[in-house]
Amino acid sequence: MSRWLLDFAVADGFAGFVRLELRETERIAWFWTYLVGVPDIEGVIVVRDHEVLLPRQALEIRAEGLWAELWCEAKREHWTIGLEAFGVRLDAPEDALRAGGEIGERIAVGLDIEWEVGDDGPPAGVVHGDVLVGRARHAIDGRGWFYDDATPDPGPVEGEVISTVYIPVGDGCVERRLVRAGGALLWSLDRREILGGRGDDRR
């Protein structure tokens, strides 16, 4: 399995992450984009697909209602992320765990953003570009962390929890929290839970 992860956060609480996993043995790819704190929009914006065909070239994926590409401009220094998709807006993070998958308001989501390494070296850097949600375009310029296949996932972070998201995975979920720690906003990658009493397939 190979994976790439971009976390980003702006000081006002607008934040998100993008993850692409190539699961070669299963011949599928997993793709996630989650956004929180979007100006003038309540709740969590979700684009999640666990049944994407493996890319035919580079890191470009296509599925129904989804196109995304992660492009390496310079290894461990500069990446570009593009997305055109339809996602859903959830009123509450827990709505992601309902039987049958995420159910919410259908909404257009787009990304045209870049990550560039910072003075401290990877994975830390800066993210800038445009995030599109519905008919609105939001320019972002903030901190970002890019984890390529050679960089371990981020771990738990302690601090004031600003937002939480849940990502259904198999019979459980991954919990990610946006945390204010040491004056900065950071994404924490927390535990994977097994959700009891659920017989449906959350893939």
Predicted feature residues:
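Structured soluble/peripheral alpha/beta segments that form catalytic or ligand/cofactor-binding pockets
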Residues: M1-R203
